[in-house]
Amino acid sequence: MKKPFVTKEQIEEIAKTYPTPFHIYDEKGIRETARALFKAFSWNKGFKEYFAVKATPNPFIMNILRSEGCGFDCSSYTELLLSGQVGAEGHEIMFSSNATPDDDFRLAYKMGALINLDDFTHIDVLDKLTGIPEFISCRYNPGGEFKTDGSPNVMDTPKDAKYGFTHDQLIEGYRILKEKGAKKFGMHAFLASNTLTNDYYPTLAGILFRTAVEIKEKTGVELSFINLSGGVGIPLSLIHISEPTRLLSI
């Protein structure tokens, strides 16, 4: 069993000052995990980790992660404000949202965030609100079901998801964005969460890199980055998790 980072006696002492319930965060563990992640991808000089603010919209945690080199993935006006308040700016912030209010797009554009369009219709919406920025990203939904080895993933049926461009919309979307003045492009996809094996990210990367080649062939658009979204799950049993994934677990 994993040893807790805080003892029963320490918790009892803290409870004398702070009324329960409360959360205690392991700053040492957070920093060590972030450093292990960056070390694992040190071979890739362009690697950037974007922490999903929705997961823990706590400015103290965000400050810790930013000091370790993380950017922020935002999906709302409030998350953009929080990211700005801890000092993040420009492409340290990636804005990915669904059913986006106009003011959210305006703020993301004003902050210089990297805007990741979730829907084909957002191209015209953003163009009318702010104009298309020179650097833009699109969220891809290939449809179907996303399975690796039968692990109990969450949200692993893209065909039923409300997020992202379909294949044909994606090709046409990049063509339109290029015509509207965009110069640099990215692509993002979220196909499953709570993944407990080593298969998810290589499989997702394969789908996106093959799609990137097709985009280049059909539109002339060459992608500057690919964002591998989704999440490493927390195992209920160590039997269901492989060693590399366990090293990244919280």
Predicted regions located by residue number:
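Internal alpha/beta core interface subdomains
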Residues: 182-193
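A charged N-terminal "starter" segment
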Residues: 1-115, 120-134, 179, 183, ...
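Single conserved hydrophobic/aromatic residue that forms the stacking wall/gate
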Residues: 239-250
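Short, well-ordered amphipathic alpha-helical segments that serve as non-catalytic structural scaffolds
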Residues: 169-175, 205-215
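Glycine-rich beta-strand-to-loop/alpha-helix junction loops that act as flexible
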Residues: 191-192, 226-233
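Conserved anion-binding
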Residues: 123-183
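Short, electropositive alpha-helical surface patch
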Residues: 195-211, 242
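Flexible, glycine/proline-enriched loop segments at strand-loop-helix junctions
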Residues: 21, 110-115, 154-165, 195-202
